[in-house]
Amino acid sequence: MNIQIDMIDHTDTLTEKQETLIRELLHEAARYEKLAEGTYELSLSFVSDEEIQELNRDYRGKDQPTDVISFALNEVGEGEQPVEPEAGTPNLLGDIIVSIPRCQEQAEAYGHSFERELAFLIVHGFLHLLGYDHMSEDEEKKMFMRQEDILTAYGLTRS
C-alpha cells in the first residue's frame, strides 16, 4: 500500500521535521486501518482561522472557525453508486484542512505539544475520509478510540 500526500502549508508554520512526522503518521494510520493494497492519494492543507471559517461557512453552514474539516471523495450519498478508481490510478481519498491557529490554541488548552494536537487533528480528518463519523454517541466513541489507538501506536500519547 502506498499513500501519496499533497501537503500545502498556507501559513508557512510547519517545519520539515513536522511535515515528516505528518507523512509517517498518515502511513501508520493507513496501516492501522488496513487499507487494501494499492495507491491512495489525499491532500492536506494548513490554513488560517479566517480561511477555515470561510470553508466551514460555505460547506457546512457554520460561520465560525473550526480545527479541522475533511472532504471525503469516496463518500457515497443516498442513491449514489461508489466510484472505483481506474486501473493504475490512485484511489483519491479527499482533502483534510487544518487550522494552525486553532491547533496551537488547543495544544495550549489541553496541555500537550503542538505536534500531538496536530497529529490528533490529522488522524481525525483521515478517519473521516475513511468513513468514520461522530454523529451519534456510539460513533463518536468508536472514532475517538481509533484516533487514540493510532496515536499511541505511533508513539504520541497525551503526556
UniProtKB/Swiss-Prot annotation:
Q: Please, one GO biological process term? A: rRNA processing
Keyword Hydrolase (UniProt)? yes
List, alphabetically, the SUPFAM superfamilies matched. Metalloproteases ('zincins'), catalytic domain (SSF55486)
UniProt binding sites for Zn(2+)? H124, H128, H134
Cofactor(s) listed: Zn(2+)
Enzyme Commission number(s) of this protein? 3.1.-.-
Q: Single GO molecular-function term?
A: metalloendopeptidase activity
* A Pfam family reported for this protein in Swiss-Prot or TrEMBL: YbeY
What does UniProt give as GO cellular component?
Answer: cytoplasm
Catalytic class of the enzyme? hydrolase
Q: What does this protein do?
A: Single strand-specific metallo-endoribonuclease involved in late-stage 70S ribosome quality control and in maturation of the 3' terminus of the 16S rRNA.
User: Which PANTHER family does its entry note?
Assistant: ENDORIBONUCLEASE YBEY, CHLOROPLASTIC
User: HAMAP family, from UniProt?
Assistant: Endoribonucl_YbeY
What is the name of the protein in this document?
Answer: Endoribonuclease YbeY
Taxonomic placement: Bacteria, Bacillati, Bacillota, Bacilli, Bacillales
